Structure formats: structure tokens, C-alpha cells
Amino acid sequence: IYNNLVSLRQKVKNAWSQIEIQLQRRFDLIPNLVETVKGYMGHESNILTKVAELRTAWANAKTVAEKSNLDTQLSDTLKTIMAVSEAYPDLKANQNFISLQQELANTENKISYSRQFYNDIVTTYNTKIQVFPSNIVAGLFNFTQETLFEVDNPEARKNVKVDFNN
């Protein structure tokens, strides 16, 4: 039983690591996107500032809840970038913008999958440490509940629009 709990806990850590990798990739893509967009809409520099602040906050965040909250804020910022760029037809034809948009869409899909996998393994782990007889072993060896990766803001539950082919 103990070995099974250790294995599940390691799977939770690995699944969280996969989320962090994809979220970091998105953080890395967005400044490139903002730089591409900035040439078309110079007066929107506050967006770049917001991204920089979120990246700093991400580096300092320690808990799943903190990182989940920052993910929500980043999604909102991304929606703003995409909404503002809608007003610039030349931008939508820019090959660099199109490429970044596709990379971002792929990353969003990977984030979604990673969240789902993480939450599935956390649910399995949390259930295992609560049911008999593994709950006895879990209590003896300090196996504690893990936090699900949840989106608090109902608006943020909507998919980020990254396709301008309409």
C-alpha cells in the first residue's frame, strides 16, 4: 500500500511539472506575440507591462492555487491581446503573427490536456489516501491531500480565442 501511495504522489508531482512546462511555454510565447503586435499598435504598451508583471509573479508563486490564479490572469491578458489585434487587418496577415498564433493554439491545447491529466491523477491520489485500508498508511506516513487545478473565474473557463481565420 505504501509503495502504491508513493507512486501516486510521484505521478501527481510529474503531472504538475507538465502543467508548469506548458504554462511556462505560454509565458515565453506571449512576449514574442506582444512584440509582433506592438509594431501595429504602439499605444497598447500596457499589455506588455502586464505580461512582465505576470511573469514575475509566476516565478514567485509557490502553490497550485497561486499559479492557477496567475494562469487565469494570463488568459485574460491573452484575450486582450487577441481582441486588440482584431482591429489590425495587416497584422492578421503577418506571417510571424500567424506562426505565433498557431504555436499558442497548440500550447493552449497542451495546457488543457495537462490540466485534465493532473486533476485526474490528483483525484485518484486523494481518493486513495481517504479509503480503507490505505488511509491508515497515508495517515502514518503523512500523505496529504493535493489541490486540484481549478479556474475560479467563470469567464476564464471559456477557451482563449487564438484563430483569426474567420
Residue ranges and their predicted role:
Residues 1-166:
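A helix-centric hydrophobic-segment signal that preferentially recognizes long
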